[in-house]
């Protein structure tokens, strides 16, 4: 699955579950091994794991080996790993996490049970951020959380990192204005204004708005791309059947409906 959607976190929860939650955390630390294949992709790195696999766990039933970014392993490392995957000891469980499944050898894939993770939708990310804000005593405007979720582009880990940074910067009250300024993103009103100017053939007004946006340090390409997304949202808002595709708050959704009509 894509980055930041909980693959490694799910792997650690799974490792905890199959060993039973009654096992102490200190004991579990010896049963779970992590390897970042992006920086440990040589044959020697895999062989060190293969040697450890033979030793049964002291407490709990399983030893769990979590290999992140497994597609980064070299061909020789994959080959060294293959025999162990074919005939693993009964106490060993391997969890392979990757963002690029197509790069993994078919001989490896055929020996695995595959779970596909998907990008986190904006409403789900917003709901999770609202829950965290409530637990941490942070007051956050819904539209501000929508901006964070959209900026994260389906990666909840990125959304949480941005949320932490914004709370450190803006304090316990997150406003839409503070979030857009800190994340350096244009608000919806800019695109609504530009579209109104275009529909009214107000070329001077549009040029002045564009100049203002450039003077604030925004990239012209991103500005045009953002406007293209805005126009796409207007087409989506014209039909009640496609309205659910708009990943915005109800207030902004109403603005899209008004402008599209």
Residues of each region from the PLM?
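P-loop/Walker A NTP-binding region and its immediately flanking N-terminal helices
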Residues: 1-114, 124, 132
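Extended, largely alpha-helical regulatory/partner-binding modules appended to the mid-to-C-terminal parts
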Residues: 11-16, 45-48, 113-261
């Amino acid at each position: 699955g894509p980055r930041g959607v909980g693959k490694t976190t799910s792997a650690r929860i799974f490792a905890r579950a199959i060993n039973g939650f009654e096992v102490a955390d200190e004991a579990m630390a010896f049963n779970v091994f992590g390897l970042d294949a992006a920086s440990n992709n040589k044959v020697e790195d895999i062989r060190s794991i293969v040697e450890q696999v033979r030793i049964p766990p002291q407490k709990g039933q399983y030893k769990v080996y979590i290999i992140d970014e497994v597609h980064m392993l070299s061909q020789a490392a994959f080959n060294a790993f293959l025999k162990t995957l074919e005939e693993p000891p009964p106490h060993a469980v391997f969890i392979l996490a990757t963002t690029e499944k197509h790069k993994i050898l078919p001989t490896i894939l055929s020996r695995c049970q595959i779970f596909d993770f998907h990008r986190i939708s904006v409403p789900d990310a917003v709901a999770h951020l609202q829950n965290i804000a409530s637990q941490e005593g942070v007051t956050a405007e819904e539209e501000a959380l929508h901006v964070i979720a959209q900026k994260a582009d389906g990666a909840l880990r990125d959304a949480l990192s941005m949320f932490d940074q914004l709370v450190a910067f803006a304090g316990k009250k997150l406003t839409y204005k503070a979030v857009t300024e800190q994340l350096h993103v244009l608000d919806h009103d800019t695109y609504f204004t530009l579209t109104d100017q275009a529909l009214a053939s107000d070329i001077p007004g549009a040029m002045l708005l564009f100049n203002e946006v450039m003077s604030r340090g925004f990239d012209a390409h991103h500005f045009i791309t953002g406007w293209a997304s805005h126009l796409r949202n207007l087409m989506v808002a014209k039909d009640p059947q496609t309205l659910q595709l708009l990943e915005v708050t109800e207030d902004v959704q109403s603005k899209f409906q008004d402008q599209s009509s």
